[in-house]
Structure formats: structure tokens, C-alpha cells
């Protein structure tokens, strides 16, 4: 029982840390927010394209997949993320 509790605790710490780090890496007009949603790139190629437009190296923290938030509000390569969720 103790091992299960410890495993659940570690999992929640890792998830929370990952989510906090994602937001800490963003600045400027990232993320794009509209009507209570964030608009996030679905794939790494879209993210890299946005980073190249901003003259950012692909190894830059803002270009890590899932850290790159899209400027465009619509498109098949964009997903909506509810802002009310704790990020």
C-alpha cells in the first residue's frame, strides 16, 4: 500500500513539474489565448515553423514540442486547450 501511494505521489510531482516548466518557458505573445482557450500546435513541424518565423533556433526552449503555442486560431494542426485547467 505504501509503495502504491509513493508511486502515485511521484507521478503527480512529475506531471506537475512538467506542466509548470512548460509555462515558465513561454513569454511574449505566447500562448495565444482566445475565448478561454489556448491554441496549441498539434505537431512538432508546426511548432518549428512558428519558431523559424521568429528566428528562434529549433533547440530553443520555446520550440520544444508542446511548448510552442500557435498564433493562428484555426487550422487542422491546432488544438484548443481549456484555460480553466491548471497548467
Swiss-Prot record:
Signal peptide: 1-19
Transmembrane segments: none
Gene Ontology MF terms: sodium channel regulator activity; toxin activity
Keyword DNA-binding on entry: no
Tissue spec: Expressed by the venom gland.
UniProt cross-references to InterPro entries, sorted A to Z: Scorpion_toxin-like_sf
Keywords: Disulfide bond, Ion channel impairing toxin, Neurotoxin, Secreted, Signal, Toxin, Voltage-gated sodium channel impairing toxin
Residue pairs linked by disulfide bridges in the UniProt entry: 41-63, 47-68, 51-70
Keyword Secreted attributed: yes
Subcellular localization(s) per the UniProt record: Secreted
GO CC terms in record: extracellular region
Family membership noted in the UniProt record: Belongs to the long (4 C-C) scorpion toxin superfamily. Sodium channel inhibitor family.
Function according to Swiss-Prot or TrEMBL: Putative sodium channel toxin.
Protein name: Putative sodium channel toxin Ts40
